[in-house]
Amino acid sequence: MKQIRNTIRRTLLVAGSLALGSALMGLPAVSSARTLDEIVASKKLVIGVNPTLPPLGIFNDKNEIDGFDVDIARKLGELLGVKTEIVQVGSPDRIPFVSSGKIDAVLGAMTITAERQKVIDFTVPLHTEVLGVLTTKAKPYKDWMELNDPAVRLVEVRGATPVKLVQEKLPKAQLLLLDNYPDAVRAIAQGRADAMIDVMDFMTEHTAKHKVDWRIVDAPIEVYFCGIGVQKGNDALREKLSAAVKEMHKSGYVDERWKKWFGGPMLHDPRTAPTYK
């Protein structure tokens, strides 16, 4: 099982590793990031947010960046006693921007990986992402490996990372590929598919549109821990932001904001991470 889990992790993170490698190829010359004292003196914390990862980051009706990450970023500024400036970043920009000192910290589904930890530092985990199985209460599945059956009809989004996992680990299952998540979820709701493997945290907005007794298989395939990225070696800032994240967890602020934006509780507690100290 350990070997399978390691294979899964390599399979799912290969795209991210390649993207990281590409990003690092284009990294600007590293300049010294602002220290915690400099941030406090300037009364401004500059945080990168990716608005193309709803509901972590979105553009609202006023064309302003909004979402879970923005709420967290503003709360971080409040806890540090400074204002927060939001800077738009894309997935390829996140690490280069924080590594070069263009921003003080970065949000945006920053999964804490060994590869990323070579070039930036992370706070304690802010939230998690759970790779799991979406199905209905009418289906008996208790473990994702039960899906490796010719009678099982899986649906996946064309080009999404789990497609390769399904093809390699669940070759006996039927596989329907559709172009987007609304269509994939609709296929299950209409009975054209039995289940889907993906990050479950982002499914609520799609499942809420269908009057179906949805169910997420209890045993997750993998859990990813996401933190806030800062420039390598900026220890005082990292420690201060980690303390702020812990305070937000303790006060219930993270849970409250997550429920607001995701429509339900976080599926896995980030405080269970070995790095949450």
What are these regions (language model features)?
Residues 49-53, 87-92, 101, 105-113, ...:
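Beta->alpha turn/N-cap motifs
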Residues 127-135, 200, 204-246, 264-277:
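Periplasmic-binding protein-like
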Residues 33-109, 118:
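Extracytoplasmic small-molecule ligand-binding "clamshell" domains
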Residues 93-96, 110-118, 165, 189-222:
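A ligand-binding cleft/hinge motif common to bilobed small-molecule-binding domains
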Residues 85-96, 141-142, 176-186, 190, ...:
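Short helix-initiation/N-cap motifs at beta->coil->alpha
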Residues 59-61, 73-82, 144-149, 162-178, ...:
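Ligand-binding cleft/hinge of the Venus flytrap
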Residues 135-153:
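Flexible hinge/capping segments at coil-to-helix
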Residues 161-176, 216, 246-277:
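Ligand-binding clefts/hinges and TM-proximal coupling segments of bilobed small-molecule sensing domains
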